[in-house]
Amino acid sequence: MLFGELAQYFEKIEKTTKRNEMMEILADLFKRVDKEEIEKIIYLLNGRVAPDYEKIEFGMSEKLVLRAMALALKVPIFDLEKVYKEVGDLGELIIKYSQNEGKDLTVVETFNTLFEIANLSGEGSVDAKVNRLAFLINSLTPQGGKYLVRIVLGKLRLGVGEPTVMDALSFAKVKDKSLRPFIERAFNITSDLGYVAKVFWEGGIEALKKIKVEVGKPIRMALAERVSKVEEIVKRLGKCAIEPKFDGFRCQIHKKENNVRIFSRNLEDNTHMFPDLVEAVLKQFSDKNVIIEGEAISYNPETGEFYPFQVTVQRKRKYNISEMVELYPLQLFAFDILYLNGEDITSLPYIRRRQKLEEAISEGEKIFVTKNIITNDPKEIQAFFEECITEGLEGIVAKRLDAPYQAGIRNFNWIKLKRSYQGHLADTVDCVILGYFKGRGHRAKFGIGALLVGVYDDERDLFKTVAKIGTGPTEEEWVRFREVLDEIKLESKPNNVESLIEPDVWVEPKYVVVIQADEITRSPVHTCGRELDGLGYALRFPRVIGFVREDKGPYDATTVKEILEMFRGQKKEKVEEDSDNL
């Protein structure tokens, strides 16, 4: 396939906001490509040349891209800069100035050159990147060049989510979505949809079924449902394991021989940030190859007390790492093991995995297996919960004893119960920032005064609004919000956002913030869970807690289903309170 043909598909996707239409366009594209192209096209759809967990970036600013364009288009850079200020999209400048109507490269040739650009480093690499990009611009159709520069700048933003791509992969093969569960299972245990698609194209459904957990490929993390009372845990699980819920970084640690990689909840490779944990893993799992999960939390070495998340988050940085190791040492509380010495053990029941974890770890001062109790007694669970709260922890997690580890799935195999506050919802809500409103009055000087936030509809692969928030952040945080959001601002509403509200500035759905609210109410202006009566669901008196949660991505946000579940639980609690007061 020629890159210009792929660009035509990008154009079609960009022009639609309908999920099914987007899926059909993708399915038509996938039908036309071979096993060598499918992997590369999946990555390019995401604006990348590798899976998300690989830190491969193009490393080219707008200034460098303009240099490459000036070189390729033979237009003075001053003229390009002047027009760019008017149109705001370097891709449109390619359309305006390119004379390459008869030229093109294949998708594979274009991808391979982009991969070279991303991997260039060291002395002379800047000029080499500019020259290679200029070669590509000069070799592609105007439309191809338009999408090329958007990819390089991280501004492709087609609004295509992984669920839509998985549906399209199935549809391309069997004209329905029946193969989606097999594709999703493979994706959940590899976090690499390009690789999964390539295996599928090479060997069909049987090859997909043979994909196994592999050290170095992060597994999409299992997630817990939430309840507001101990009794609900016993009702759903009966006899179960109860573990503490720590307020730190959830980590998935991969060790093979002397190589260690540490992935965050949203599958970022954070290995370099935690040299103390790497050292501990090599010591405490010295003769084993493992994938374990746990929660890393900073603590006061003099008192043994755990620091709150706002302190722990300071360990997540690129610079002065050794200084942070000394200031805020970490402990890791391991709660699961998914792979051991060549064996994928995700299918084993929780109780067996727990046993293998305890057997695999050696004693040390950094990594511990989380304590737990096994019971079906609500009083015993309540006592354990209160003990955790007293220790400064978030709450507890209950786990079904016979449950396998279900990668990427949120269900009632795991149930979390967090500390609640009088007049608040029993749990916070993780929302995605969709846009912002310019400040008025005192906040006019910041240029930002409120956020439009939403939750994720995982059935329709859309973000839906749930609140407009103007309280919580400090003045310094408002300034930081403006800075980070302006880096991802958009000219119009993204295709994967459903909203009745128009903020002053739309942004790419990328950053997650934690929201505390008093309750959930029905709303005529928000689209979360919107029903035939025109009413959706909204957070009442929402407040932002802290700044952006860098350990969470947009698809880790609270879902529409969870909001509806919280609303039903809230109504049930009110009925019970009213009956208690009779």
Swiss-Prot record:
It catalyses: ATP + (deoxyribonucleotide)n-3'-hydroxyl + 5'-phospho-(deoxyribonucleotide)m = (deoxyribonucleotide)n+m + AMP + diphosphate. The active site is at 245 (n6-amp-lysine intermediate). InterPro entries: ATP-dep_DNA_ligase, DNA_ligae_ATP-dep_bac/arc, DNA_ligase_ATP-dep, DNA_ligase_ATP-dep_C, DNA_ligase_ATP-dep_cent, DNA_ligase_ATP-dep_CS, DNA_ligase_ATP-dep_N, DNA_ligase_N_sf. GO terms for molecular function: ATP binding; DNA binding; DNA ligase (ATP) activity; metal ion binding. The keyword Metal-binding applies. Its EC number is 6.5.1.1. Its cofactor is Mg(2+). GO terms for biological process: cell division; DNA biosynthetic process; DNA recombination; DNA repair; lagging strand elongation. DNA ligase that seals nicks in double-stranded DNA during DNA replication, DNA recombination and DNA repair. PANTHER family: DNA LIGASE 1 (PTHR45674:SF4), DNA LIGASE 1/3 FAMILY MEMBER (PTHR45674). Belongs to the ATP-dependent DNA ligase family. HAMAP family: DNA_ligase. This is Probable DNA ligase. It comes from Dictyoglomus turgidum (strain DSM 6724 / Z-1310). The gene is lig.
